[in-house]
């Protein structure tokens, strides 16, 4: 059984027991969260596709950890003009473990 849900402007394909890295959620570590924006649920040959969301579809997950991703360097450069700027960015993320999928 697997499902596709939407969180943080992105779509994720998950199954029970899987750990997924999402955009930062303001929920403490160890707490549970429910995702109601379920786009599709598949159980063997039975597939439910939402328009846009599956009615009654809920994905339950437990927050495992929060953190920051790898650093991305941004460089602004003009040749022959002695001009260079560097900037870095580290995106916040939340790791969640999927505990249940229901339709």
Curated annotation (Swiss-Prot):
GO terms for biological process: translation. Disulfide bonds: none annotated. The keyword Chaperone does not apply. Keywords: Ribonucleoprotein, Ribosomal protein, RNA-binding, rRNA-binding. The keyword Ribosomal protein applies. Belongs to the bacterial ribosomal protein bL21 family. This is Large ribosomal subunit protein bL21. It comes from Shigella sonnei (strain Ss046).
